[in-house]
């Protein structure tokens, strides 16, 4: 069906993105990138914030390459998160003004003050300590990013935008299948807000569907969409884009062989 085709394209572009990132270290085939991407997805399902994806992809490479592979994976995931955050903030802002949310602005102001204070101390702390992300210092991470060719960054962000457009449209297409009366613009505003809210909540990837569903049910309730409909759509999205690919990924995990060392 068309929904499955959209899921295939979603992962096709993710695999292309990974293949391109890895090419800065060594050339790999599309099939190798597919094996690593789906194998990483399978490993990530039972780990917090999909951290298993980093280790799973790294062990496909020789020991001397593994640290850089982790960094490349971090850059690939970060680009997707940046797109989700930017479009999500825009969507959530429009959502707020469209539906006139009943917010306690005094509490919001206090939270913003706390966030600013914490951010200020964090920036100061980063300058005074050896803070690390995924085991790497900020200085090394920045240097690694700077040393990557500009075309790699452009390619990376370009494919991240394409993937975002695909799975967002897939959600909208499911709304149409379930005969939900909602225009494309309104749906995209709510969908982008949903992905933002879901992405900032740490969880096991296997429970990702619960977080997305909760956010979707809450946001779509303002548009008068039935809870059961949103629950069904969110579950289908999860099955198509995570469970189905992870089933194929489990084959690669079960048949995995450590690479020959070059030591």
Locate each region found by the language model:
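Predominantly cytoplasmic-facing regulatory/coupling regions of multi-pass membrane proteins
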Residues: 1-37, 94-201, 240-263
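Secondary-structure boundary/capping signal
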Residues: 29, 50-51, 182, 204-205, ...
């Amino acid at each position: 069906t068309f929904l499955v085709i959209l899921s295939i394209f979603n992962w096709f572009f993710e695999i292309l993105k990974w293949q391109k990132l890895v090419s800065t270290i060594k050339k790999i085939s599309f099939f190798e990138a597919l094996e690593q991407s789906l194998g990483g997805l399978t490993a990530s399902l039972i780990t917090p914030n999909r951290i298993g994806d980093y280790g799973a992809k790294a062990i496909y490479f020789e020991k001397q390459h593994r640290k850089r592979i982790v960094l490349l994976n971090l850059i690939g995931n970060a680009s997707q998160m940046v797109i989700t955050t930017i479009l999500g903030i825009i969507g959530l802002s429009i959502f707020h003004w469209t539906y006139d949310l009943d917010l306690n602005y005094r509490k919001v102001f206090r939270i913003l003050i706390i966030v600013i204070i914490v951010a200020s101390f964090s920036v100061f702390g980063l300058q005074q300590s050896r803070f690390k992300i995924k085991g790497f210092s900020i200085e090394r991470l920045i240097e690694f990013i700077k040393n990557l060719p500009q075309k790699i960054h452009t390619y990376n962000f370009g494919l991240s935008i394409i993937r975002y457009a695909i799975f967002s449209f897939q959600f909208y297409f499911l709304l149409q299948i379930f005969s939900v009366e909602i225009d494309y613009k309104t749906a995209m505003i709510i969908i982008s807000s949903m992905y933002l809210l879901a992405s900032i909540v740490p969880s096991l990837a296997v429970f990702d569907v619960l977080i997305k569903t909760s956010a979707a049910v809450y946001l779509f309730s303002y548009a008068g969409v039935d809870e059961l409909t949103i629950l069904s759509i969110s579950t289908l999205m999860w099955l198509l884009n995570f469970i189905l690919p992870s089933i194929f990924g489990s084959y690669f995990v079960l048949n995995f062989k450590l690479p020959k060392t070059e030591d």
